[in-house]
Amino acid sequence: MRTPTCLCLLLICMLISCTPTQEKHEIDYTSYVNPFIGTDFTGNTYPGAQAPFGMVQLSPDNGLPGWDRISGYFYPDSTIAGFSHTHLSGTGAGDLYDISFMPVTLPYKEAKAPLGIHSKFSHDDESAYAGYYQVRLTDYNINVELTATERCGIQRYTFPEAQSAIFLNLKKAMNWDFTNDSHIEVIDSVTIQGYRFSNGWARDQHIYFRTRFSKPFEKIELDTMAIVKENKRIGTATIARFDFNTQEGEQILVSTAISGVSMEGAAKNLQAEVPENNFDKYLAATKANWNRQLGKIEVKSDNEDDKVNFYTAIYHSMIAPTIYSDVDGAYYGPDKKVHQADGWVNYSTFSLWDTYRAAHPLFTYTEPERVNDMVKSFIAFYEQNGRLPVWNFYGSETDMMIGYHAVPVIADAYLKGIGDFDAEKALAACVATANLDNYRGIGLYKKLGYIPYNVTDSYNAENWSLSKTLEYAFDDYCIAEMAQKMGKKDIADEFYKRSQNYKNVYNPATSFMQPRDDKGVFIKDFKADDYTPHICESNGWQYFWSVQHDVDGLVNLVGGKNRFAEKLDSMFTYHPSEDDELPLFSTGMIGQYAHGNEPSHHVIYLFNSIGFNDRTQYYVAKVMNELYKNEPAGLCGNEDCGQMSAWYVFSAMGFYPVNPVSGRYEIGTPLFPEIKLHLANGKTFTVLAPNVNLSLIHISEPTRRSYI
């Protein structure tokens, strides 16, 4: 590696008050948001309208299933078959697409299922920014505009002169989603309400809605059909058609509130958030809301693409988790009962295996009040379900992925002194979840100090034994840190001991973490670059480094700093062969490093721990400049509910939380000459790197340490 030329980096923390420019939003940050980033390749994002952390994600659906269309939208497609109110951002499993509307002129185009009623469209007639989406439906010459409040979606259709109709399809389902039952009832000539119940990734999902049209419909047709499963009727599939006679340029607004609780809850949400037919008013309010959020981090740069990538990353990091309680505080719990969040907001859509790494640590600085409510949501979930969430949304635990990663989110919040959540209840929930002997090998983990690959339980069908051992060890460390701070020495000692279990799957003969059976024998014919059922979405190279809580211990385990440096270098230089068939999640590859999936995200920063800071800086800059682009295919892997973007936000600011609960941030290399992080307590953290550019990425020491 060449001898680095160094730039000067200054880290400044100063106390200031909120400035007038922050309140006036003289900079329109939404203009730097490109919601189409991630809608191509493997990003799995959607371009539609949403308020920050909003319950409603109002976005177009292409109408076709498939892994590329998990978000409902895939940039290479050329059809739109509806605009639905719920979506998942960047996940690897598909669900939701609830309450789907489609405007048409008569006669309309209908294809065989699954596409159904649809229209062609062109990207030349499509635009979007934070809180807004627009497209012209080519086949009907209808212009569609979308915006959203937290719990409501507002659509504005501009029609030609024609006999027109608006379809509401509660039968439509894609990917893992399946309609169980649905219902529509007419309140008056402009108001309807109903529900859609479904099964899929989210089990027994309930979505209720209330919709108001700005113009009375002339006629309504209901198409209902029985839903039959195993020769038994389980519900009704409903499609409604609302007819209108429209003039050239006439606009009809469709305002819809949703609720997980009841039609009455949806009606309250609509009345509270969208009481009138005024698209521009609510668009302006949501745009202002996004500007407040995006303006929490200011950057100065002459590179427009870098600013778009950065503010789009902040935007994507604030898509999830999502608000789940109604305006009156009611929400539907995992116990299938209605509960009340009094004085706080209940949140859902927690992709914790992904987001505990960077997204939630970022929230502790940009969203401390929401973090408090998220922890309260975890505690409530535990009280209603008997364990903390793993991957939950819309009142359902999916049990997707591994670990008990609500724990680091809770511990980080507690150790930073955030909020007024009940720490005693929170710690009790963490300890109880970590001691569920019949859940995903935890009992064997406690008994043997690792999870054997040859023993399964009812929750362990996917195996992933090696990865679970490493993830549990990290989560146990987080419990220990929280207990230690609370003065609970017995709990702390127990879980500090458990946090060392990562050493039990290290094989000195191969110098890799390696699966073991219940007799303690390491699996035979182990190849670190193989993708096997024992390692979660990764290979032995990628998961080896998942010891974020004890990097010094890992260094010693492999034989010291020199050996560690050799192994870490090999991670980035041992490239897959051209004949290797890599799985979907192995993308953004640099050697064996896979930036497209989360287990690799902290690895670049491990060079700091052995004094090779320049290598951290080199690879951080390489990833930021080569794997994040201002284009639809601009993400190299699943967005994963904000984690992919949160990595970029932290790294662009010049630091990253390798161990998310340590309060320690490894210094990388900033992307911008000046960055200001405005904190909720009125302080501003400023990073200055006045000479930074693509060829000048290495920094002189800002402190005597490689971290802050």
Where are these regions (language model features)?
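Positively charged n-region of N-terminal signal peptides that target proteins for export
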Residues: 1-5
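Sec-dependent N-terminal signal peptides
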Residues: 6-10
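C-terminal motif of bacterial Sec signal peptides marking the signal peptidase cleavage site
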Residues: 15-17
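Accessory carbohydrate-recognition regions in carbohydrate-active enzymes
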Residues: 23-360, 364-408, 414-470, 478-504, ...
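ATP-dependent phospho-/nucleotidyl transfer catalytic cores
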Residues: 475
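Single conserved hydrophobic/aromatic residue that forms the stacking wall/gate
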Residues: 697-701, 705-708
